[in-house]
C-alpha cells in the first residue's frame, strides 16, 4: 500500500525517485522443538584485451575469447574462469573489465620514411634529373608507452639528414589497445584501395590489422586516407578518425597519423618532379603510383626492404604491403608478468580488483544506465574485494552480488564463523547472497582439475536457468531446480546432510546462508536461495528480488522517457496505457498480480513531480512440506 506520508524526492534536478514499500514482512515463529536480458559484471586479468575500462561482450564465448583470450588457471585464477564460464553459457551479456597495472605498457610501432633527392649526371643536353628515393622502417618507441594518450610523442626522429643524406619523418604510430606482451602478435599492413580511388579525390588505402599468434589471421580492415582534411559526403576518411572511432573503429589498435611527414614526402617529390599535377592528398608515397592512371610515377623510387640501407638503432627496414605485416614492438605485463614473484603478483592483482570494484579504474562501473547488470559474482576474492562488490551492488541498486566463502573451509561447523568474521553485518541487504560451497572443475586451458568456489557454477548456471524458464521467477534452488553440476565427482564441499547436520543447517538457514546439500537421490543441490536482508519478507527469496529489480529497471526507463513531457490528464492516461504494457509482461507469468498507475497530488503537481504507483504480489513458494500420516485401527462391525 502507498506510504502514509509525502515522499520527498532525493534530488532537485529532473530524475526518477523510486520508493519500494515491502509489505510482506513475516514475524518469525518457532515450533516447540525449534525481462530483461541477464547480464553479468566481471572483473579479471587475462592474456589480452582492452584494459581498465568496462566493455560489453554480446557475442558469447567466441566474442569473449576474441577480446580477452583464455589462459591457465594458475596464472589468471577464478575471475577469468567465471567470466569464461558465463560466456560459454550463451545465455547472458557480459560487462567485462580486464585489469592491468600501471607499470605495464602498450606494444606499439612507428612507421618512418627516410628520403633524399638524388641528382643524376648531366646528359648531352646539360640537364640533370632529380629522383626521390624513399625507404620505410619500423621504429620502436623511445620509452615504454604507459598511456595511449602519448601515442603521438612516444617515438621521435631527428629530422636532420644522416650520413647518407636521408631525412627521417614519422608517418604514423600504431599502438595496441591493451597493455601486455600480447601486443607483439599484432601486425598491420597497408595496401592500395583502387576501388575508392575512382570514387573520390584522395589517395585511398586499405589498413589491415592481423593477429600472428596462430598464423596470419586478419582481424580488421579499414578504408582510409592519410590526410586529416580528407572527407567524402561529410564523412571523414582520415585514418585516425576511421580507426580510432569508438563505435565503428578498431578494437585492436589505435593510431596517430602525422600530416607533416606525408607533406614532407610530397614537397620533396615536387622538387624532384615539378611538372607533377597531383595534389598532396592524391600523392601516393607508399607505392609511387598515379591514382588516376594506375601507372608508376616518374622521378620516385620506393626502395624494397631487402635493398634498404642499414637500419639505425631500434629500426627495421620494412615493406608496408608485406604479407607478413608490420609487427608491433615492445609492451609488457609489468607486475603481472608470468615470471613475477607469485606473492607480489597476487598482491598487485588484489589491489587492481579492489580499485576496479571501487570505481577507481573506470567510474563507469557504477553506472546502471551504461551497463545494466543482473549479477556481480565474487570469484574467490579477498575480504576487501568481496565487501567492495557488495557495496557496488547496493550503490547501483539494479543487481545482486553473490559472494562466496573462499576455498579454505575444511569443517562444516566453521561456515557461519567464516561469514560472521568476514562480513559481519555489513552485507545485510536483499541484493546480496552468501554461497559457501566450493568444488573442483577442469581448467579449460590445461584440462587439469582446479578448485573453484560456488560462483563459478553460478556464473554459468544462473543465466542458463533464467533462459530455460524464460524469466527470473523460477528459483535456482531445491531438489529439482537447484541441482549443482559440471564438477569433478565427489568434489563439492562443504555439503550438508539433514540426517547428520540438521542443527548446522538450521543455523545457516537462520543466518540466510545458502548451503549445498545432498538430496534423496544422492545429488548435490543448492538448498536455499535466501538474500541477506535481516527481516523475513518475500524479498528474502532471491527470485523475488530479481523480479523486483527488473520491474524497478523497467519503471525507471519508462519514467525517464517522460522527462519534460506534459502531465495533463490526457497525458497521464497515455502514460497509464504504457505502464500497463510493462505490468502485463510480469502478470501471471512471473508474479501473481501486479498493478501500476500514474497520478500526482497537489504538492507533487506544484513541483512538476509525476508519481508512479506499483503494487505487486509475488507467487508463493513451497519450501517446507508437512506430511501428516494417520495410522488408524481397523474396526469390526458385528
Features from the language model and the residues they span:
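Structured, hydrophobic secondary-structure cores that serve as assembly/anchoring elements
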Residues: 1-110, 123-130, 282, 290, ...
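Long, low-complexity, intrinsically disordered terminal regions
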Residues: 11-13, 197-200, 213-215, 232-233, ...
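A structural detector for beta-sheet-dominated domains
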Residues: 21, 58, 97, 112, ...
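Short, surface-exposed linear segments at secondary-structure transitions and domain or protein termini
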Residues: 64-65, 106-107, 195-206, 224-256, ...
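Generic structural motif
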Residues: 94, 153-155, 184-192, 253, ...
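Intrinsically disordered, low-complexity serine/threonine-rich repeat tracts
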Residues: 105-110, 118-135, 139-147, 154, ...
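Extended, beta-strand-rich, solvent-exposed assembly scaffolds of outer structural proteins
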Residues: 120, 124-129, 133, 137-242, ...
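Low-complexity, serine/threonine/proline-enriched polar segments
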Residues: 233-312
Amino acid at each position: 500500500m502507498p506510504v502514509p506520508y509525502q515522499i520527498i524526492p532525493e534530488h532537485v534536478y529532473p530524475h526518477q525517485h523510486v520508493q519500494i514499500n515491502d509489505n510482506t514482512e513475516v514475524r518469525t515463529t518457532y515450533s516447540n522443538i525449534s525481462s530483461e536480458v541477464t547480464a553479468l559484471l566481471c572483473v579479471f586479468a587475462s592474456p589480452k584485451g582492452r584494459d581498465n575500462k568496462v566493455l560489453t561482450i554480446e557475442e558469447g564465448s567466441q566474442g569473449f575469447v576474441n577480446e580477452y583470450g583464455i589462459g591457465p588457471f594458475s596464472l589468471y585464477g577464478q575471475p577469468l574462469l567465471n567470466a569464461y564460464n558465463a560466456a560459454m553459457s550463451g545465455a547472458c551479456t557480459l560487462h567485462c573489465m580486464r585489469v592491468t597495472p600501471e607499470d605495464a605498457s602498450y606494444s606499439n610501432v612507428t612507421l618512418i620514411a627516410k628520403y633524399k633527392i638524388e641528382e643524376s649526371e648531366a646528359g648531352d643536353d646539360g640537364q640533370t634529373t632529380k629522383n626521390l628515393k624513399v625507404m620505410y622502417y619500423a621504429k620502436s618507441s623511445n620509452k615504454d608507452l604507459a598511456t595511449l594518450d602519448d601515442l603521438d610523442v612516444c617515438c621521435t626522429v631527428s629530422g636532420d639528414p644522416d650520413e647518407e643524406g636521408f631525412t627521417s619523418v614519422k608517418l604514423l604510430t600504431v599502438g595496441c589497445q591493451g597493455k601486455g606482451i600480447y601486443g607483439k602478435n599484432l601486425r598491420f599492413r597497408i595496401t592500395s584501395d583502387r576501388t575508392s580511388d575512382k570514387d573520390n579525390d584522395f589517395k585511398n588505402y586499405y589498413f589491415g590489422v592481423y593477429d600472428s599468434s596462430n598464423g596470419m589471421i586478419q582481424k580488421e580492415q579499414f578504408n582510409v586516407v592519410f590526410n586529416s582534411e580528407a572527407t567524402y559526403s561529410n564523412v571523414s576518411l582520415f585514418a585516425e578518425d576511421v580507426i580510432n572511432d569508438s563505435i565503428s573503429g578498431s578494437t585492436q589498435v589505435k593510431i596517430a597519423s602525422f600530416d607533416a611527414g606525408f607533406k614532407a614526402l610530397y614537397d620533396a617529390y615536387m622538387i624532384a618532379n615539378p611538372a607533377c599535377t597531383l595534389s598532396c592528398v592524391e600523392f601516393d608515397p607508399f607505392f609511387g603510383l598515379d591514382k588516376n592512371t594506375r601507372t608508376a610515377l616518374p622521378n620516385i623510387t620506393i626502395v624494397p626492404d631487402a635493398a634498404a640501407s642499414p637500419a639505425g638503432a631500434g629500426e627495421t627496414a620494412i615493406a608496408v604491403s608485406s604479407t607478413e605485416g608490420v609487427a608491433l614492438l615492445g609492451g609488457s605485463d609489468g607486475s603481472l608478468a608470468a615470471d613475477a614473484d607469485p606473492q607480489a603478483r597476487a598482491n598487485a592483482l588484489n589491489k587492481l580488483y579492489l580499485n576496479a570494484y571501487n570505481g577507481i579504474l573506470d567510474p563507469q562501473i557504477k553506472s546502471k544506465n551504461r551497463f545494466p547488470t543482473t549479477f556481480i559474482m565474487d570469484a574467490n576474492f579477498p575480504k576487501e574485494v568481496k565487501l567492495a562488490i557488495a557495496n557496488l551492488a547496493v550503490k547501483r541498486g539494479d543487481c545482486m552480488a553473490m559472494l562466496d566463502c573462499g576455498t579454505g573451509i575444511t569443517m562444516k561447523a566453521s561456515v557461519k564463523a567464516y561469514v560472521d568474521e568476514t562480513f559481519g553485518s555489513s552485507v545485510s541487504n536483499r541484493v546480496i547472497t552468501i554461497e559457501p560451497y566450493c568444488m573442483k572443475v577442469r581448467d579449460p586451458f590445461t584440462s587439469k582439475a582446479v578448485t573453484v568456489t560456488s560462483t563459478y557454477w553460478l556464473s554459468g548456471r544462473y543465466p542458463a536457468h533464467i533462459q530455460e524458464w524464460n524469466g527470473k521467477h523460477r528459483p535456482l534452488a531445491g531438489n529439482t531446480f537447484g541441482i549443482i553440476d559440471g564438477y569433478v565427482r565427489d568434489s563439492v564441499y562443504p555439503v550438508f546432510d539433514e540426517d547428520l547436520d540438521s542443527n548446522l543447517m538450521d543455523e545457516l538457514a537462520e543466518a540466510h546462508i545458502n548451503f549445498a546439500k545432498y538430496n534423496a537421490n544422492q545429488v548435490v543441490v543448492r538448498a536455499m536461495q535466501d538474500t541477506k536482508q535481516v527481516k523475513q519478507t518475500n524479498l528474502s527469496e532471491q527470485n523475488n528480488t530479481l523480479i523486483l529489480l527488473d520491474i524497478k529497471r523497467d519503471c525507471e526507463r519508462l519514467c525517464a522517457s517522460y522527462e519534460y513531457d506534459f502531465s495533463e490528464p490526457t497525458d497521464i492516461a497515455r502514460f497509464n496505457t504504457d505502464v500497463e504494457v510493462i505490468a502485463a509482461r510480469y502478470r501471471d507469468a512471473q508474479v501473481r498480480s501486479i498493478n501500476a498507475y500514474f497520478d500526482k497530488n497537489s504538492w507533487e503537481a506544484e513541483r512538476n513531480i509525476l508519481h508512479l504507483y506499483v503494487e505487486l504480489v509475488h507467487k508463493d513458494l513451497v519450501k517446507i512440506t508437512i506430511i501428516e500420516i494417520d495410522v488408524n485401527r481397523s474396526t469390526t462391525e458385528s
